[in-house]
């Protein structure tokens, strides 16, 4: 049985890498550090850092904290968090992902220009909470591209100028499906960009938004900006190919991970013999037995952008030692 470890489309993204690196440096220096929320949506990695001295706190605890240092994770935070920090004399170590920080700026400018901001994402995801905070929490969050959730679309003002953006880790096809359905919905209520045949919304760039904000040419009434992180979305096709190339897939990620859910579904669609775990104690021996009763020929180990590479190596090592490995893979 060959064990193949995916190093090209699995493991921490750049934003999470930066956060973990800073957290480790701070902990090495002082042995203690507060983190607002889980530093990453991976329980195993959180426990590793907590063992080094990190303390994870929630918003109520953060609001009671005084004169301490607090890490802001890659997901980012709304303006209210920074206001609390100033009020409570808290030193903020801000590791917001640059892609997320740029998106927050875009959301803020669109809101200031009077746009109703629609966010394709998950309402309680910390990144979305941070983005919506830039809109005074007035953004409309939609998770279902088919507009099937009436509660999600109920707040929409179909006569107002509107901009569509996205949580950085959502799926690209879903974003464009949502755009298409919003175009149809708004057009049915008589709101479309002048000169468009079927109510197409117009793509805008940062320079367009900045220009209007500084008194330049006005943007169309109905616009969209694809803000999905391409470093994340580019993994989709690679991971699909990886899943197809192996008899069995063991996908390691935290169950809180939004990206993990998306990537696992890609693996599962490509290869029905794909299994989700958080750690090695969930691995089952029957996964590695083929329909002929013999061991499968290959097992692929992969994970999410929030999965540390050391955990994937641990999984490969465990499977290799427990069930056998003839690939010559040094990680197994």
UniProtKB/Swiss-Prot annotation:
Family annotation (CDD domains): lytB_ispH
Leading EC class: oxidoreductase
GO biological process terms held by the UniProt record: dimethylallyl diphosphate biosynthetic process; isopentenyl diphosphate biosynthetic process, methylerythritol 4-phosphate pathway; terpenoid biosynthetic process
Record: residues binding isopentenyl diphosphate: 41, 75, 125, 257-259, 306
Molecular function per GO: 4 iron, 4 sulfur cluster binding; 4-hydroxy-3-methylbut-2-enyl diphosphate reductase activity; metal ion binding
Keywords, comma-separated and alphabetical: 4Fe-4S, Iron, Iron-sulfur, Isoprene biosynthesis, Metal-binding, Oxidoreductase
Highest rank taxon of the organism: Bacteria
Binding residues for dimethylallyl diphosphate: 41, 75, 125, 257-259, 306
Enzyme Commission code(s) on record: 1.17.7.4
Known cofactor(s): [4Fe-4S] cluster
The record's free-text note on cofactor binding: Binds 1 [4Fe-4S] cluster per subunit.
Active site annotation, chain numbering: 127 (proton donor)
Binding locations of (2E)-4-hydroxy-3-methylbut-2-enyl diphosphate: 41, 75, 125, 168, 257-259, 306
Protein's job: Catalyzes the conversion of 1-hydroxy-2-methyl-2-(E)-butenyl 4-diphosphate (HMBPP) into a mixture of isopentenyl diphosphate (IPP) and dimethylallyl diphosphate (DMAPP). Acts in the terminal step of the DOXP/MEP pathway for isoprenoid precursor biosynthesis.
Name of the molecule in the record: 4-hydroxy-3-methylbut-2-enyl diphosphate reductase
Species of origin: Chlorobaculum parvum (strain DSM 263 / NCIMB 8327) (Chlorobium vibrioforme subsp. thiosulfatophilum)
Phylogenetic lineage: Bacteria, Pseudomonadati, Chlorobiota, Chlorobiia, Chlorobiales
Originating gene: ispH
């Amino acid at each position: 049985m060959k064990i193949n470890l995916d190093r090209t489309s699995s493991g921490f993204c750049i934003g999470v890498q930066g956060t973990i690196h800073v957290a480790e440096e701070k902990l090495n220096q002082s042995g203690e550090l507060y983190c607002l929320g889980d530093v990453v949506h991976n329980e195993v990695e959180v426990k590793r850092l907590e063992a080094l001295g990190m303390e994870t706190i929630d918003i109520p605890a953060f609001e009671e904290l005084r004169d301490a240092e607090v890490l802001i994770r890659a997901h980012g935070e709304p303006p209210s968090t920074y206001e609390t920090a100033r009020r409570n004399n808290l030193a903020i170590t801000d590791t917001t992902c640059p892609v997320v920080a740029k998106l927050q700026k875009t959301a803020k400018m669109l809101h200031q220009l009077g746009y109703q901001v629609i966010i394709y994402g998950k309402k309680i995801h910390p990144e979305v909470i941070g983005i919506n905070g830039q809109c005074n929490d007035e953004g409309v969050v939609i998770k279902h591209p088919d507009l099937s959730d009436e509660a999600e679309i109920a707040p929409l003002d179909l006569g107002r100028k509107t901009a569509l953006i996205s949580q950085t880790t959502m799926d690209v096809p879903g974003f464009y499906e949502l755009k298409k359905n919003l175009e149809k919905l708004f057009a049915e209520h008589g709101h479309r960009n002048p000169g468009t045949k079927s109510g197409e919304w117009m793509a805008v760039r940062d320079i367009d938004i900045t220009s209007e904000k500084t008194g330049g040419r006005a943007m169309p009434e109905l616009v969209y900006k694809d803000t999905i992180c391409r470093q994340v979305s580019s993994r989709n096709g690679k991971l699909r190919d990886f899943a197809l190339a192996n008899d069995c897939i063991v996908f390691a990620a935290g169950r809180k991970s939004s990206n993990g859910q998306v990537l696992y579904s890609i693996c599962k669609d490509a290869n029905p013999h794909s299994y989700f775990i958080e750690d090695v104690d969930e691995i089952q021996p029957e996964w590695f037995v083929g329909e002929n009763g013999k061991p499968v020929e290959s097992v692929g180990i992969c994970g999410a952008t929030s999965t540390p590479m050391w955990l994937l190596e641990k999984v490969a090592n465990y499977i290799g030692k427990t069930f056998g490995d003839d690939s010559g893979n040094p990680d197994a």
